[in-house]
């Protein structure tokens, strides 16, 4: 438990202290956000706000994770694990793709960075590497970081994918989650605040899996998850980094996370869902991100078939802005929705445990 607190605290401190440094540095370099002309008129005032703040989130994540392990040496805590390093690597790789996207936008002074093909190739390389490695590194109880079974709260024994389909599934999750978080990052603090809530829920889930792991506590309801405590450190560091960044990203934002942050955080959600065996549960806990992405899919599909729009603008947080809601009202209410989704997900997680032990 101490390591989890250290991870969150270090990440928060690094993120909250580094972000204003980045604001000044990026402002001097002219690394400002370009705003879509077709977006809400109120957003035009945000043009030039420093972007690529995801660098601070990644720095906080790395500092929190490795710092907690360095402190853990003092009381013989377990070191870094395959699962933790894989999620950290996937997160960083997606952050690298996002950084390139942001940098191109800034250099060309437009709101379009990497083309769709280049971005998809970057996501593909990261996801395939993650998927292949996730089936290696067998640990106690012959567990690997990933599983060829589809999972809800734990593996569903009757649904087996096979290694090739599993790797393809990893790409689907990485692409879906990274793009979902990217689409959500359209209002000040919306993505960072929502991610803090989701990762906070996953701190609870991974710590519970650690306390009830089949490796150390075999019995009814135990969890076959490799390295749950190390995954808890990743979640805690991620949550701390997001909260620290949110201090400066809250409305009116002094800096945006950019694709550097949003793609990285989406990659983290994908990696955590796979390594914790909660791929379907993540859809519930991350329901806000799912809804934002779904609103875009619905808008495009309906418009192409009927030339009519379901929403005034997609993603649908802009729909409410154009309906007259203040930006801060949309943000706070969406945070509440993210909190409700996280609470429902935790309730489902615990109710499954009670059912498993016959409670």
UniProtKB/Swiss-Prot annotation:
Q: Which residues form a coiled coil?
A: none
The listed locations are: Cell membrane
Membrane-related topology note:
Multi-pass membrane protein
- Cofactor (UniProt): Mg(2+)
Q: Tell me where it mainly resides.
A: membrane
Protein's UniProt keywords contain Ubl conjugation? no
The UniProt record lists the EC number as 2.7.8.13
Identify one Pfam family in the record.
Answer: Glycos_transf_4
From the UniProt record, give the pathway where this protein acts.
Cell wall biogenesis; peptidoglycan biosynthesis
A single MF term (Gene Ontology)? phospho-N-acetylmuramoyl-pentapeptide-transferase activity
Q: What reaction does this catalyse?
A: UDP-N-acetyl-alpha-D-muramoyl-L-alanyl-gamma-D-glutamyl-meso-2,6-diaminopimeloyl-D-alanyl-D-alanine + di-trans,octa-cis-undecaprenyl phosphate = di-trans,octa-cis-undecaprenyl diphospho-N-acetyl-alpha-D-muramoyl-L-alanyl-D-glutamyl-meso-2,6-diaminopimeloyl-D-alanyl-D-alanine + UMP
The entry assigns this protein to a family as follows: Belongs to the glycosyltransferase 4 family. MraY subfamily.
According to its UniProt entry, the function of this protein is described as: Catalyzes the initial step of the lipid cycle reactions in the biosynthesis of the cell wall peptidoglycan: transfers peptidoglycan precursor phospho-MurNAc-pentapeptide from UDP-MurNAc-pentapeptide onto the lipid carrier undecaprenyl phosphate, yielding undecaprenyl-pyrophosphoryl-MurNAc-pentapeptide, known as lipid I.
User: Protein name, please?
Assistant: Phospho-N-acetylmuramoyl-pentapeptide-transferase
